[in-house]
Amino acid sequence: MGDLIFPINPGAALAIHVALSAGIVAAIIVVAAWLREKRSGARADVPYEGGVLPAAPQQGPVNAPYFLIAALFVIFDMEAAILFAWAVAARDTGWLGLIEAAVFIGVLLLALVYLWADGALDWHKERRR
């Protein structure tokens, strides 16, 4: 049925799609660079966060344990997306799909236990290495 609507080679359609996508991205980058406000000077190089200018220069690296928690959230959030897709097709996959989902959940639980034992989920404690 697809041949009746679009009589084009699938490879050519993919190439056209990739070329158009790359062209749109390039056009957006060029327009953004052309329209941005061009400022120079000492004030333009000062970091700006929340409307408050920094009182003193930053001394040393910033301890950011929330980055690790955010990365773990993204990893385990993907679990929910994959399991949702499995749940939609659960009747079609049968027992084999159930076993595969159980193995997937088991591997993620092992990863969670490892991260917990490693101290990756402790906010204020120093992680063991």
Swiss-Prot record:
<dbReference type="InterPro" id="IPR038430">
    <property type="entry name" value="NDAH_ubi_oxred_su3_sf"/>
</dbReference>
<keyword id="KW-0997">Cell inner membrane</keyword>
<dbReference type="GO" id="GO:0050136">
    <property type="term" value="F:NADH:ubiquinone reductase (non-electrogenic) activity"/>
</dbReference>
<keyword id="KW-0472">Membrane</keyword>
<keyword id="KW-1278">Translocase</keyword>
<comment type="function">
    <text>NDH-1 shuttles electrons from NADH, via FMN and iron-sulfur (Fe-S) centers, to quinones in the respiratory chain. The immediate electron acceptor for the enzyme in this species is believed to be ubiquinone. Couples the redox reaction to proton translocation (for every two electrons transferred, four hydrogen ions are translocated across the cytoplasmic membrane), and thus conserves the redox energy in a proton gradient.</text>
</comment>
<dbReference type="GO" id="GO:0005886">
    <property type="term" value="C:plasma membrane"/>
</dbReference>
<dbReference type="GO" id="GO:0048038">
    <property type="term" value="F:quinone binding"/>
</dbReference>
<dbReference type="GO" id="GO:0008137">
    <property type="term" value="F:NADH dehydrogenase (ubiquinone) activity"/>
</dbReference>
<feature type="transmembrane region" description="Helical">
    <location>
        <begin position="95"/>
        <end position="115"/>
    </location>
</feature>
<keyword id="KW-0520">NAD</keyword>
<comment type="subunit">
    <text>NDH-1 is composed of 14 different subunits. Subunits NuoA, H, J, K, L, M, N constitute the membrane sector of the complex.</text>
</comment>
<dbReference type="InterPro" id="IPR000440">
    <property type="entry name" value="NADH_UbQ/plastoQ_OxRdtase_su3"/>
</dbReference>
<dbReference type="Pfam" id="PF00507">
    <property type="entry name" value="Oxidored_q4"/>
</dbReference>
<feature type="transmembrane region" description="Helical">
    <location>
        <begin position="14"/>
        <end position="34"/>
    </location>
</feature>
<keyword id="KW-0830">Ubiquinone</keyword>
<keyword id="KW-1133">Transmembrane helix</keyword>
<protein>
    <recommendedName>
        <fullName>NADH-quinone oxidoreductase subunit A</fullName>
        <ecNumber>7.1.1.-</ecNumber>
    </recommendedName>
</protein>
<keyword id="KW-1003">Cell membrane</keyword>
<comment type="similarity">
    <text>Belongs to the complex I subunit 3 family.</text>
</comment>
<dbReference type="GO" id="GO:0030964">
    <property type="term" value="C:NADH dehydrogenase complex"/>
</dbReference>
<feature type="transmembrane region" description="Helical">
    <location>
        <begin position="67"/>
        <end position="87"/>
    </location>
</feature>
<keyword id="KW-0874">Quinone</keyword>
<keyword id="KW-0812">Transmembrane</keyword>
<dbReference type="InterPro" id="IPR023043">
    <property type="entry name" value="NAD(P)H_OxRDtase_bac/plastid"/>
</dbReference>
<keyword id="KW-0813">Transport</keyword>
